[in-house]
């Protein structure tokens, strides 16, 4: 095999030398240079030259791609973090980042090429982008150091990178790019930014017992790897958040992410072309993540039809290529849903009755959480958050009115934006009295219509 490869390379090299000598004999120097540059751009000659250099080179190369087969490469992230953290007085190229005004400046290496030495072995890292825009870290080292590099060195780099990343862990929120742009855009499947929502379980305005139940369930899931391995079930969990607008569904998701330190993947189903693209997005999510589909009853027609009927007309024809209910069900708990670990899936809806029961049954959505109108317990949390008070002589009147009215926590919070305590509480009482009067009028009108 070696002899055959050597013979083939020798034959190709001889052919190149013949072409080159012919060019030098019959063409002027400028034409020679133009032709030589043109030949270099021809893919077959470029591949040939790369193979020749690789064959005779004493160096070996290891590439770490950001995406491998549509899946995120965790080794790439660890290597990139490790290289970026190697900051000292000898480094000439740095980049500074300050994501918040009151945070300290974060310095990272911004070198395209980085020289590294480990146990007396020299090697070189390069960071560059491939044709599709994804980054690649390439390690170059002498072949004689193969055992050291592929053994202890790479283990050290990956573990150190993971350790640095854990110490500087930041929650990110990602949204899926429209599938029509996947081939032309350099952004890939997901676009991300840092998540800065301050919500915590302490500040959530909801029933304390229900909040504690959700908190304990999340912690048990986070610490449940051995449990899920023992029962032979994929390490994932589903939560259905339902209730009127303004009851804190999005805030609950933010509190979940801040508690778990998981990234949020905000999945917009209407920008996905078909079920295959939905699977592709799932594969591209990372472990320790929360996949969110907000207002799922508005995203697609998921009210009971498992298949989209093939009706006439362009409008109906387009539907056949869209995400179907069966595709979404496979996304939740099909074979492909087990391609990662430690994932949480969250659906939100204002109208739970509109959803197909197959979508929200136990096992898919393990916990159904109703976020309803403001209770007195939720009000007390809001009063502590906004006004920094635990009690007040107007609390009794407010408690009585809350039992007789329907008002969301968001509306209650709006009346507490003023820092003056008495004025805020009195304004809330007036609002509750107006709501109570309006509700009574509606009841009387309904009774009159019934008569």
UniProtKB/Swiss-Prot annotation:
Cofactor(s) needed for function: Mg(2+)
GO cellular component, one term: mitochondrion
Record keywords: ATP-binding, Hydrolase, Magnesium, Mitochondrion, Nucleotide-binding, Transit peptide
EC number: 3.6.1.-
Keyword ATP-binding: yes
SUPFAM superfamilies: P-loop containing nucleoside triphosphate hydrolases
Keyword Nucleotide-binding in record: yes
Molecular function as annotated in GO: ATP binding; ATP hydrolysis activity
GO process annotations (BP): response to stress
UniProt cross-references to InterPro entries, sorted A to Z: AAA+_ATPase, AAA_N_dom, ATPase_AAA_core, ATPase_AAA_CS, Mitochondrial_chaperone_BCS1, P-loop_NTPase
One Pfam family named in its UniProt record: AAA
Reactions listed under catalytic activity: ATP + H2O = ADP + phosphate + H(+)
Cellular location(s): Mitochondrion
Binding residue positions for ATP: 243-250
PROSITE patterns noted in UniProt: AAA
Enzyme class, spelled out: hydrolase
Family indicated by similarity: Belongs to the AAA ATPase family. BCS1 subfamily.
Name the UniProt record assigns to this protein: AAA-ATPase At3g28570, mitochondrial
Organism: Arabidopsis thaliana
